[in-house]
Amino acid sequence: MEKRWWHNSVVYQIYPRSFCDSNNDGIGDLQGIISKLDYLTTLGIDVIWLSPVYQSPMDDNGYDISDYQAIAAEFGSMDDMRELMQKAEQRGIKIVMDLVVNHTSDEHPWFVEAKNNKNSEYRDFYIWRDAGENGEAPSDLGSIFGGTAWEWDEENQQYYFHLFSKRQPDLNWENPAVHQKVFDMMNWWIDQGIGGFRLDVIDLIGKEIDKKITGNGDRLHPLLQQMNQATFGNKDLLTVGETWDATPETAQLYSNPARNELSMVFQFEHITLLWEDGDKWKPKPLDLNAFKQVMIKWQLELSNNGWNSLFWNNHDLPRVVSKYGCDGQYRVESAKMLATTLHLLKGTPYIFQGEEIGMTNVAFDTLEEYKDIETLNFYKVKTDSGVSHETMMKGIHANSRDNARTPMHWDDSAHAGFTQGSPWISLNPNFPEINVAVALEDTDSIFYHYQKLIALRKQNPVIVYGDFIPLFEDHPAVFAYERKDADQHLVVLNNFTAESQTLTLPEHLTDKEVECLIANLDPVTHLGSHLVLTPYQSIVVRL
């Protein structure tokens, strides 16, 4: 495999609205991010994935873009953006822009003109259909945010298509003029000096509406190859696609270098395992064996013909320590264990802001405290269909996107040092105990565990390129594996439970003196025939 710079990089995702507010309007901004670059340098990351900061009416917190080449005033200006890129570059950090090209805002000039003039060149930039015989929607396709994916436009006497909110009309990727406009815009950003793109719901751009195909349409991969050739293909940029329905087979189509599409994709098979019947509002406990089967499958099947992205959480998902670990008694131990589990795998790790200090889910008491459009839409859809308020709030507490979007905890001052104004969303009340200032003062904190994991990846090519060999595949409580190349042999052992686990080690690991590279509890220097892992214990040793 040809080595690329992003193979041994670690990416840190920033959700700007909730990261750091420099002007005290309650909304995080670009100058706030600039003020924290030294913190990120201390952590050791070398890429920032920046959630959208483009001009937007913020119906979906910036994932509804009204101008791709302007910065939303609440985040700052293009001068601030250039300053961020320059100061990040001085610290060896690249900026990956979050790009949404499946849809735009309904306030984008393209859509405004398409709506106002049926003869406009922009009319066919979007998907319009006549009503059915009785005025009904053209099909029963549903919006990902709940309800129908069709919105009636009274003035035009037609429906337009929106897979997300009605204020996020889908672009018509069957129109070559759309390709050209999007590719020109992408090249403009590349010329500004960005390090790559995270492509939002990119598996939807090949949709075939009249066949009711939304994801993974036949045109998807030819479109991505066209995008690659026209924009980032020869620029050595990191590109990662959000692909909710990806399998290892389709992930190879996206990320095999020979196909000239993307660097890697985000797959969500390990995420949806914790949804009952695929419904995120019906959470279910972690089945570790099922989870391991998914992770092992992805590690083995992409080992030579693609590249994995490694992540636990992001701006759309609940906090990792609350979902997969224990956010109470064993918060610190389980957060470190989960970090080790992920960062020793083969692929590019992603850290979501606050993950490195063990931030937890929030359980707001009232629906009114939630700001997320998906949460509010689905609350109405579900309760209208008979789901009780109590049941729905339980699902919201577990899986609302706002779990990830409460402000970053910088210290124990008012509003956690995020702002001196009134924050756009309430804080998690545990910020006095869980914050950056506390973490930096404690050499045994979760933060320094992440710092060490990042350093280990940089120092040990076996973590980046070595073979992945599963251990104890059927053990219901332990996720263990080996990483091996011609020079090094690592063993990674992780207890996912609050009970001690006794392992009978295989013969090739028995009676060995070992070097402990990282542990969340006491280090191990000798492997006998048996090993006891205490609750949430995690060990990485080198033979």
Predicted regions mapped to residue ranges:
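Flexible loop/turn segments at secondary-structure boundaries
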Residues: 56-57, 103-105, 204-209, 246-251, ...
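Beta-strand-rich binding/interaction modules
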Residues: 500-520
